[in-house]
């Protein structure tokens, strides 16, 4: 007769050197990642918790203690958001958590700007949109929040954006990257039209595409397409671009799964 008692299972796990570990809560997992600096810690924690008032309170205390407001964007706000993104990537927290944290991050950035008298340097500009005919913008909103939280200037064109408007925005803003999201299979073909318009006008920037209707095979069919499986891939692709990987083929090698 098979013995499925706890004691028996422990013996099996011990035999095969498998540790019985209690899963960490999201809060416990985050606690292990927070910086130890007593002024930075409460800010990073408030970012993770999505508490805008606590973020501002922590920033105020840090500034009064002599921290530079602009430096706090990288040293505290970005650090806190880094914890959020890491735990999201690991499946510990979910998209609503990321959105709340991104809002808290943006509130913190505004507070730092107001108290410095200077405008923090952005990494670069990214134009974002939802495919023409598609009104589902939750994915796009997450992408824009993550890009802003990671130091990018985002030009958000909204949802149901005609290809001509996308082209005009790219020509005006000269971004390092364009993003597009689509939830409906009937709308994702607009990305090919955008791609062709860009090429016809001599524009060869990476076009990161994602969303429920989109897959890697589809995005790989057009010249500028780079597939982002998750919203969190957007800032990673942008970071790769500003680090020097601007060739679409190289970006695909880095981010595509097959």
From Swiss-Prot:
Residues 123-248 form the B12-binding domain. Keywords: Cobalt, Metal-binding. GO terms for cellular component: cytosol. GO terms for biological process: homocysteine metabolic process; methanogenesis; tetrahydrofolate metabolic process. Methylcob(III)alamin binds at residue 136. One of its GO terms (molecular function) is cobalt ion binding. Residues 30-124 form the B12-binding N-terminal domain. SMART domains: B12-binding_2. CDD domains: corrinoid_protein_B12-BD (cd02070). SUPFAM superfamilies: Cobalamin (vitamin B12)-binding domain, Methionine synthase domain. Transmembrane segments: none annotated. NCBIfam families: MtaC_Meth (NF040655), pyl_corrinoid (TIGR02370). Harbors a corrinoid prosthetic group and acts as a methyl group carrier in methanogenesis in the methanol pathway. The methyl group of methanol is first transferred to the corrinoid prosthetic group of MtaC in the cob(I)amide oxidation state. This reaction is mediated by MtaB. The methyl group from MtaC is then transferred to coenzyme M by MtaA. Belongs to the methylamine corrinoid protein family. Heterotetramer, composed of 2 MtaB and 2 MtaC subunits. This is Methanol--corrinoid protein. It comes from Methanosarcina barkeri (strain Fusaro / DSM 804).
């Amino acid at each position: 007769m098979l013995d499925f008692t706890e004691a028996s299972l422990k013996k099996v796990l011990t035999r095969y050197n498998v540790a019985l570990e209690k899963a960490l809560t999201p809060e416990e997992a985050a606690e292990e990642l927070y910086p130890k600096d007593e002024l930075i810690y409460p800010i990073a924690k408030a970012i993770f918790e999505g508490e805008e008032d606590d973020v501002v309170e922590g920033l105020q205390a840090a500034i009064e203690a002599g921290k530079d407001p602009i430096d706090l964007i990288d040293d505290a706000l970005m650090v806190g958001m880094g914890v959020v993104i890491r735990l999201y990537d690991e499946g510990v927290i979910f998209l609503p958590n990321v959105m709340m944290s991104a809002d808290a991050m943006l509130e913190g950035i505004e507070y730092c700007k107001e108290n410095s008298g200077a405008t923090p340097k952005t990494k670069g500009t990214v134009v974002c949109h939802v495919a023409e005919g598609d009104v589902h913008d939750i994915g796009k909103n997450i992408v824009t929040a993550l890009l802003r939280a990671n130091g990018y200037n985002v030009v958000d064109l909204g949802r149901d954006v005609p290809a001509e408007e996308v082209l005009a925005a790219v020509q005006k803003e000269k971004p390092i990257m364009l993003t597009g999201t689509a939830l409906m299979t009937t709308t994702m073909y607009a990305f090919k039209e955008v791609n062709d318009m860009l090429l016809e006008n001599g524009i060869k920037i990476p076009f990161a595409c994602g969303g429920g209707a989109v897959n890697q095979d589809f995005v790989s069919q057009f010249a500028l397409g780079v597939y982002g499986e998750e919203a969190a891939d957007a800032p990673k692709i942008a970071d790769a671009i500003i680090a020097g990987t601007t060739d679409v083929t190289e970006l695909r090698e880095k981010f595509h799964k097959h």
